[in-house]
């Protein structure tokens, strides 16, 4: 049996799976083929369980298609493949990294997937008091399709700091949970190693600290502080734009931390290469580990967020009320929680039960503003401008891809961002049938899974229309 078998499986999996999934779950696996058994080694238990649950059938199917009745048995283990005398005895993943997902510099070794920091006995009192918010944990982060990969990547980093995906770069619009995940990682790291030095900050704080250090002739102390951390969590890295001295200092800090296997996690409101005013060498390094998007939450996740938030406040929120709010407020988690806080406050002040009519009254101005901001006309104009076509093209019978794909995108956005029915949306797009709208919505949903570009387009348009 050829020892290139796992390489064949990798090539097929890379073709079949979304690039982010392949990079996150399949690439870290190491393989060893022996005695008709293919052993797959995962860097930690979390990865092992995920791969076995989600991809076991895919891998077994490929083995059978390549080998037929002689397909090897699969075995999963945590750790690294054993060192053998024969170089061919072990096969590791060397498939080229997918573009724009996990980029590595040619002169730098690929990110390691070691088992994490060595466990050390916890001192009676931690020697360093972190500024991580203990209220933000993985347990109270509501997971959905829109943030599943980001949460999974953050969970792995918390379990394997300095090894799994370093740096981790999370990007997405305001209020989608990036900051929550930063703090959750920090809490996860300190749960495993209570004396770890974990520093969370907004990027502007880094700039302010550097300016003070320069004014006080204390730049060496500044460098020592930031390069001594076990994990550096920086929010809104886009605020480094056009701050050349800050970028220069962060560049050297970044390199020093990675060389020391110290974890870096960054967030931004946009993909690294789209951050204007930041040096290319920094943007390149941002992609050395793993880059994951967080998208606006889908309806089911919005409902779950409202129900969990209400439960945390000991408030009974009827399901139909949560659905009513979630259907109308779509842009981000912060907006949802703010609306719910207003509903709860009004209920406490008035002593009234929380019903749909009560919510409609309590959120009257917010709901009116939302309906005014997002209309089908607005969506059509925004999409046409984004794709550099005319609104008339969206309404026409033209079927060329340059028009059909934007039209499908606009229909999907209309379904996502407005309360119009499918027939109403179809009417607004040149009198099309509701089945055409349904097909468009399903097509865009499929393409968001398969195409990084379509996923980016959808997120960018959602962000534009919701701002």
UniProtKB/Swiss-Prot annotation:
Under the heading SUPFAM superfamilies, the entry gives: P-loop containing nucleoside triphosphate hydrolases (SSF52540), TrpR-like (SSF48295)
A Gene Ontology biological process noted in the UniProt record is:
regulation of DNA replication
**Pfam families hit by this protein:** Bac_DnaA (PF00308), Bac_DnaA_C (PF08299), DnaA_N (PF11638)
Question: Region Domain IV, binds dsDNA: start and end of each range?
Answer: 348-467
A molecular function (GO) term: ATP hydrolysis activity
Where can this protein be found? Cytoplasm
Task: Give the residue ranges for region: Domain III, AAA+ region.
Answer: 131-347
Annotated region (Domain I, interacts with DnaA modulators), positions in chain: 1-90
Please verify whether the record's keywords include Cytoplasm.
yes
Quote the PROSITE patterns the UniProt record gives.
DNAA (PS01008)
Q: Report residues binding ATP.
A: 175, 177-179
Against HAMAP family, the record matches this protein to: DnaA_bact
Function text = Plays an essential role in the initiation and regulation of chromosomal replication. ATP-DnaA binds to the origin of replication (oriC) to initiate formation of the DNA replication initiation complex once per cell cycle. Binds the DnaA box (a 9 base pair repeat at the origin) and separates the double-stranded (ds)DNA. Forms a right-handed helical filament on oriC DNA; dsDNA binds to the exterior of the filament while single-stranded (ss)DNA is stabiized in the filament's interior.
* Entry remark concerning the domains of this protein: Domain I is involved in oligomerization and binding regulators, domain II is flexibile and of varying length in different bacteria, domain III forms the AAA+ region, while domain IV binds dsDNA.
What name is this protein filed under?
Answer: Chromosomal replication initiator protein DnaA
- What species was this sequence derived from? Escherichia coli (strain ATCC 8739 / DSM 1576 / NBRC 3972 / NCIMB 8545 / WDCM 00012 / Crooks)
Give me the gene this protein comes from: dnaA
């Amino acid at each position: 049996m050829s020892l290139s078998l796992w390489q064949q499986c990798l090539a097929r999996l890379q073709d079949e799976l979304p690039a982010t999934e392949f990079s996150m779950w399949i690439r870290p696996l190491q393989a060893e083929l022996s005695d008709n058994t293919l052993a797959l080694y995962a860097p930690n238990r979390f990865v092992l369980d995920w791969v076995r649950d989600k991809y076991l059938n895919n891998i077994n199917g490929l083995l059978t298609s390549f080998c037929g009745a002689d397909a090897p048995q699969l075995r999963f283990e945590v750790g690294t493949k054993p060192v053998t005398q024969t170089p061919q005895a072990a096969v590791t993943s060397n498939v080229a990294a997918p573009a724009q997902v996990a980029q590595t510099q040619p002169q730098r070794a690929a990110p390691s997937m070691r088992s994490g920091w060595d466990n050390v006995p916890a001192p009676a009192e931690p020697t360093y008091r972190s500024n991580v918010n203990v209220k933000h944990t993985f347990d109270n982060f509501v997971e959905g399709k829109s943030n599943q990969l980001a949460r999974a990547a953050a969970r792995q980093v918390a379990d394997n700091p300095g090894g799994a995906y370093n740096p981790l770069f999370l990007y997405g619009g305001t209020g989608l949970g990036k900051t929550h995940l930063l703090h959750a990682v920090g809490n996860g790291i300190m749960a495993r190693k209570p004396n770890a030095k974990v520093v969370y900050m907004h990027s502007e704080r880094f700039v302010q600290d550097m300016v003070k250090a320069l004014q006080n002739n204390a730049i060496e102390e500044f460098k020592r502080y930031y390069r001594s951390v076990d994990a550096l969590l920086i929010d809104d890295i886009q605020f480094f734009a056009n701050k050349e001295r800050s970028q220069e200092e962060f560049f050297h800090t970044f390199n020093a931390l990675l060389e020391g296997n110290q974890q870096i996690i960054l967030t931004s409101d946009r993909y690294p290469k789209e951050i204007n005013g930041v040096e290319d060498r920094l943007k390149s390094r941002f992609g050395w580990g793993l880059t994951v998007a967080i998208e606006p939450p889908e309806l089911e996740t919005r409902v779950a967020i409202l129900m969990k938030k209400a439960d945390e406040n000991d408030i009974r929120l009827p399901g139909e009320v949560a659905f009513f709010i979630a259907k109308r407020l779509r842009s981000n988690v912060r907006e949802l929680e703010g609306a719910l806080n207003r509903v709860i406050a009004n209920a406490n002040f008035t002593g009234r039960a929380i019903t749909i009519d009560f919510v409609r009254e309590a959120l009257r101005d917010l709901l009116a503003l939302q309906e005014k901001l997002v209309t089908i006309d607005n969506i059509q104009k925004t999409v046409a401008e984004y794709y550099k076509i005319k609104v008339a093209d969206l309404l026409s019978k033209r079927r060329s891809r340059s028009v059909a794909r934007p039209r499908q995108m606009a229909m999907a956005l209309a379904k996502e961002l407005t309360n119009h029915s499918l027939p109403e949306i179809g009417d607004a797009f040149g009198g099309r049938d509701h089945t055409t709208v349904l097909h468009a919505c399903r097509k865009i949903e499929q393409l968001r899974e398969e195409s990084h570009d379509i996923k980016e387009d959808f997120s960018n348009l959602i962000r534009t229309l919701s701002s």
